[in-house]
C-alpha cells in the first residue's frame, strides 16, 4: 500500500512539474513572426481581458497558440497587471519578455515635432501625416475640438506649445494635443509670473498673442527683446503695430507668398495696418523665448525696425531714421558678389 501511494504521489508531482517545466521552456523561446517581418505592432484597448490579449497577439500575426499564452499570463502571476497600449513585438521576443513588456507598460513610442512659429493649419497637417496616431481630431471642427479638450469657445491658434512629443502607436491625437495645450499653459504662466513693469500687455492671453507676433517677426534670437520693445512701445502710445505676419495670417491660405500694397489695405481682423491694438488671437505657436520676450521687452524708445537682409534687424526711434534704414537695407541695391 505504501509503495502504491508513493507511486501515486510521484506521478502527481510529475503531472505538475513536467508540464510546468515545458511551459517555462516554451515561454523563453522566441516567438515566430511572419516570414520577412522584423517586428509587429500590437494594440491593446483599455479593459481588454488576458484571454483577449492573448488572442490579439495571435491576430497581430504572431505564430502562437492563444490558450498557451493565456496560461503563461496566469502562471507567471502577471495576468492582472497587463496594461493597455501600443507595443512592438520584435524578432527574438519571447512570450516571457512580451508578458513583462505588457505588464510594465513598455509601449512602443513614436515622436511628433510641433515647430515654433507653426500656425494651427500646419499643426493639423502634421497630425494628419502621422499614421501612427489615431486621428480622432480630423473629423472635428475647431470648435468641437477645443470643446473635446475642455476649452470651449477658445480658438486653437497658439494654444499648443511647440516641442517634440513622444506617443504610443495607436494613441489619440487628442491626447497629444492635450499635453501640448497643458505645456503651453505651464510655460505661459511661468513667463507671466516674471513679467516686467515695462510690459504693456494686461493679460496672459494678450501676452500669448504678442509672443506669436514676436515669434514670426524674429530672424535672429538676439533681436527678440528689441522687437518686443518696439511692439510694447507702440501699444503704449496707441500706435498701430503694422506687422506683416499678422496681415499675412489674415489673408489665410490664399496668400501666395507676395505681400502687396493692396493686401495692407485689405481690412481684416488681423490687419494691424488698418486696426489698432493686438489681433483677436495668436497667429502662430510661440516658443519659450518668444513668450518671455513678450513680457520682458528690452528697455528702449524704438518704434520701428527693418530687416537688414542677414536675419538681423535695424531699430529706429524716429520715422526719419527708419526711412533711412529702409533705403540702406532694402531699397538700395546690394553690391555685387566678389
What are these regions (language model features)?
Residues 12-17, 60-61, 84-86, 136-140, ...:
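N-terminal start-of-chain detector that recognizes signal peptides
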Residues 8-12, 39, 79-81, 118-121, ...:
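Short low-complexity stretches enriched in small and charged residues
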Residues 3-4, 46, 319:
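Short alpha-helical segments used as structural interaction elements across diverse proteins
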Residues 49, 129-134, 147-338:
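Bacterial extracytoplasmic/cell-wall-associated proteins, especially those involved in peptidoglycan
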Residues 1-39:
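N-terminal type II signal-anchor transmembrane helix
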